[in-house]
């Protein structure tokens, strides 16, 4: 007889091999047809008591998505779905940042020389087309990753109504008195010919000069100091700015010496000056810094006067203690000179070259003007050093961290120009400053990880006023009018509203296309001929910082609550989007636009190195999807500590693939062994089933709590350990005998099946937010007792607790099992046995049912017969004797319980009677 035909072997149509790369696109297509998945999620939770809104930080509509984009969007979508399966109403409106330098630069490359002949309107139209093209490209690339969002109704910062909303936000800030136009040094990208905000600057190592220059004090100054001659020795790392020197700053709290050579240094730095060979160190006089205040020195380059001033910014950690001060080229310099009413000179044009200011202000001798006017500043350093002659006391080169433009990757400069600023320290918000209010809001915000609040807090504490103006073409205009005669900017509600309405209908292009008379109301008190336009555009960080107002507060989108539950981006956005949104939100609403902030790290190769094409270590999300499957990409993210940088490589993805197979095969085993289950009624669970259900209760609860706290790696670690060690490693293995060999309706078999069905149901619920594709697929092959009324994954829920804790203390059994298998390893190694079914276990206690104890140790039976003892061990004073089973092997179940060879054991004999009937 072929006994195999009599076994109740597992059966399921749920495939062992997932074929993810091949099959995922088909399922994703179904999810996105008529926005099926997202709309169903909305419909299923329309009566939910709680809601969760994740406001999407907009990527640039420029280029294809990379692995970092995939990390970001998958993490967002997983959190959205976590809240959905918790029973909450969710909203996820994706968006794109469509303005700004990255897009404009790409268009410039496409247009080449043709750009020079185009109007601003035409250039902006090319930018709009470029952005539209990449919105469509990126949207499809995100959908290829199975990311569920409101893809049919995204927000685009270049939409007409959006530009109007950004402009209205700007006007609100202006009306609060927080907007100011002034000439001030700002980061300037000469390569992009535009001002930059702090968030648009990245720091790299750069080699520069370190020079010490003697500025001779004039006769009056020497007389006042009671010396025949003296020279202020300044230190600088930017020789090219010396032509614009207006002052020399000293620290008011320090003492300064005049050496025997007549050189002035800070007392605290005299020793280092001696070491550099600048002086012998012999002191002629020592005075407090304030004794030098308002004395005048002579600039050796041009003979112009340079005033000695006090500056708290002057440090004693390097240099001479006297700082070269050019108010047009440094923020500290600017503020220090402002107190003394010193003129700001700016002899550098927008492309980083010296301009006619050199001639107009006499900043260089006339015979040098032709050589220097039009010369790029970074090519002037050596020439300046040569001109200094003997006044150059010391020169060396050093490498330091220097600001670079984030897009052109060229070093930036400080350049004083007229710019628009949002003021950080004016008490305009109910007597408080924007800085104070923003810091208060941060304390009310939940951060994941918690360290984020300190990081952004220190940035807000120390940041300067926000420069929001740019001198480019593609962006939202700072659409204000200026009085032609007085040059005063006009802040008028009627004008604001009229321009906003025009933008809403015609887009911000109207600012360039329309004449002034068409941009003001017909009966306006202002006359078009007396007005002129401000043509600067807004920093793109203002655009994105205003998105909460344009998306959540405008009513134009079904995007959820007016205040986002969460903002989620890379950790670099502490200085970017998180901060710009905080400042804009606090300025107009006196409230942060978010309740919580979650940050993730960046993607690196397996060695922790940044990915780059030149290194050949780039792994694209498309490659992962087509090679391994999106589900593997998702699991890689969820198994990683996303708060730090995430390493990715083929080796790592293969390891993740193994973990995925472990999950999939466990689900498959559970489905296959519950296929013929008719109901979930069981009189009483067997001890082993109570044990696994108790373990599952603890693990499922802990995993769920971890997932709800966005600690996905922790949740999966708990879950995978349970699946490997307890479920697959013990329970499923020891349950095979009763599942396959007991009769179909046997109580022991039914108990195991019900336990498995309950665990399978909860496991699918737990995995639904994280591995939605696999769960959706599994449901198609699951017993109705597991899937219930669910037509697909979006009908599942995590609202019910899995509560099957029978209070089992398994300490004794787990310890006994461990010691048992230590002995088994020895017996197998010595080739005494091949299988534990060749054994019986002899015990003297009666704590557990013998039949279940035999299953626990996977022996043929618990016996008290005098059989050959092969090994023994002890646990908690209870003795275990491993003996050689004396009965014959059952040809059906393979246990040594038969009285005769080739004869079924009593259990199998009874089962076979039922089969034959």
UniProtKB/Swiss-Prot annotation:
Chain ranges for the short sequence motif 'KMSKS' region as given in the UniProt record: 610-614
GO biological process, one term: isoleucyl-tRNA aminoacylation
Function statement: Catalyzes the attachment of isoleucine to tRNA(Ile). As IleRS can inadvertently accommodate and process structurally similar amino acids such as valine, to avoid such errors it has two additional distinct tRNA(Ile)-dependent editing activities. One activity is designated as 'pretransfer' editing and involves the hydrolysis of activated Val-AMP. The other activity is designated 'posttransfer' editing and involves deacylation of mischarged Val-tRNA(Ile).
Any one of the GO CC terms: cytosol
Class of this enzyme: ligase
Positions of ATP binding: 613
Gene expressing this chain: ileS
InterPro entries noted in UniProt: aa-tRNA-synth_I_CS, aa-tRNA-synth_Ia, Anticodon_Ile_BEm, Ile-tRNA-ligase, Ile-tRNA-ligase_type1, Ile-tRNA_ligase, M/V/L/I-tRNA-synth_anticd-bd, Rossmann-like_a/b/a_fold
Protein species of origin: Campylobacter jejuni subsp. jejuni serotype O:2 (strain ATCC 700819 / NCTC 11168)
Required cofactor names: Zn(2+)
Binding residue positions for L-isoleucyl-5'-AMP: 569
Keyword Ligase recorded: yes
Family: Belongs to the class-I aminoacyl-tRNA synthetase family. IleS type 1 subfamily.
UniProt-recorded name of the protein: Isoleucine--tRNA ligase
EC identifiers of the protein: 6.1.1.5
Subunit note: Monomer.
GO-annotated molecular function: aminoacyl-tRNA deacylase activity; ATP binding; isoleucine-tRNA ligase activity; tRNA binding; zinc ion binding
